[in-house]
């Protein structure tokens, strides 16, 4: 208590030297009383040290628990968000791929079955014997060569550059078989009405029914029915079966020339029956084509549904975690 009063603070470093310490005067009670006071002070010092240690331990434990809870909550939230995002992305990719593959497989299988059905009924309905079974045993048939019932023409040279430089609404049909054989669209119109086109080179022998304004490239042959006994649609269905049989495959590129097309012989029932059969087959063909066009749209719709439900479930899980963390902190 007394020593600090004699410290020399005038120096840069405060000090209490030995000579000054020796000069400090102190008052003492009897020895017995000194010993009692010293014992009391020692006890008090020990109790203070114990109390300080206990308080320090308690505060450290509380602080550690609070910090641990906060850090755990933050870390848990961050990890949960990161893992959930990664998991969601992975699941979304996997499920989308699986769904797309499954849908494509299912719809493609259905399409193949429809095409098989169509081919079966087309061949059945165009067979002379079956036509007589359905419409009567005495149904007469007439046989013609294509040149006897049709005007036969060929398309003209139409380049891709010409199509780019002359844009319009009228399709240009070529030797391609995808996209209904359409190469592009221009403002010109070489044909207008009901026609049949066929591919002369490359994928030779593929037949299309046309109705409206269009153009044909030089790799396309064009037929215009001139005989009133013949239904153009019915003729197109007959040629879809018969024309491929006359394709010349010995050359480097398969061909079905105008000359060969002109010589093909076909048999026809009366016009009324031709029209009935053609209407049935045309409706069936349209159904198959609609299914082909509908596959990508169906897959896209299912993907959107999948994304919606994935997002809904992900947000719901996140909300539940937030509520759980809030409850634990409170």
Curated annotation (Swiss-Prot):
GO-annotated biological processes: DNA restriction-modification system
InterPro entries on file: Restrct_endonuc_typeI_TRD (IPR000055), Restrct_endonuc_typeI_TRD_sf (IPR044946), Type-I_RE_S_subunit (IPR051212)
This protein's record includes keyword DNA-binding: yes
Any one GO molecular-function label of the UniProt entry: DNA binding
Keywords: DNA-binding, Restriction system
Keyword DNA-binding: yes
Induction record: Detected at low levels after 6 but not 96 hours growth (at protein level).
Pfam families for the chain: Methylase_S
Assembly and binders: The methyltransferase is composed of M and S polypeptides.
Domains (record comment): Contains two DNA recognition domains, each specifying recognition of one of the two defined components of the target sequence.
Described function: The specificity (S) subunit of a type I restriction enzyme; this subunit dictates DNA sequence specificity. As the bacterial DNA is methylated on this sequence and this is the only type I methylase in the genome, it is probably responsible for all of the methylation on this site in the genome. The R subunit has multiple frameshifts and is probably not expressed in this bacteria.
Family listed: Belongs to the type-I restriction system S methylase family.
Cited PANTHER family: TYPE I RESTRICTION ENZYME ECOKI SPECIFICITY SUBUNIT, TYPE-1 RESTRICTION ENZYME ECOKI SPECIFICITY PROTEIN
Protein name stated in the entry: Type I restriction enzyme MpnII specificity subunit
């Amino acid at each position: 208590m007394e020593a600090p009063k004699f410290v020399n603070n005038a120096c840069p470093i405060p000090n209490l030297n030995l000579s000054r310490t020796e000069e400090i005067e102190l008052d003492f009670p009897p020895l017995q009383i000194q010993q009692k006071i010293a014992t009391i002070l020692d006890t008090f010092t020990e109790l203070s040290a114990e109390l300080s240690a206990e308080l320090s331990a308690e505060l450290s434990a509380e602080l550690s628990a609070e910090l641990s809870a906060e850090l755990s909550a933050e870390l848990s939230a961050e990890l949960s968000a990161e893992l959930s995002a990664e998991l969601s992305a992975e699941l979304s990719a996997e499920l989308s791929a699986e769904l797309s593959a499954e849908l494509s497989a299912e719809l493609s299988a259905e399409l193949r079955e429809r095409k098989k059905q169509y081919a079966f009924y087309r061949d059945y309905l165009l067979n002379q014997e079956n036509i007589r079974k359905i419409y009567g045993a005495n149904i007469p048939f007439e046989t013609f060569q294509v040149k006897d019932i049709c005007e036969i023409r060929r398309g003209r040279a139409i380049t891709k550059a010409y199509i780019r430089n002359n844009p319009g609404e009228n399709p240009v049909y070529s030797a391609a078989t995808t996209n209904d054989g359409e190469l592009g669209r221009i403002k010109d119109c070489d044909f207008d009405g009901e026609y049949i086109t066929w591919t002369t080179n490359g994928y030779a022998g593929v037949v299309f029914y046309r109705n409206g304004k269009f153009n044909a490239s030089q790799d396309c042959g064009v037929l215009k029915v001139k005989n009133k006994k013949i239904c153009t649609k019915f003729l197109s269905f007959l040629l879809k079966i018969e024309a491929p049989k006359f394709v010349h495959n010995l050359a480097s590129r398969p061909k079905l020339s105008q000359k060969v097309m002109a010589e093909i012989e076909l048999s026809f029932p009366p016009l009324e029956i031709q029209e009935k059969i053609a209407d049935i087959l045309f409706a069936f063909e349209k159904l198959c084509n609609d299914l082909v066009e509908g596959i990508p749209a169906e897959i896209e719709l299912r993907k959107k549904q999948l994304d919606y439900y994935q997002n809904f479930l992900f947000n719901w899980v996140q909300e539940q975690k937030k509520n759980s963390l809030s409850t634990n902190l409170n």
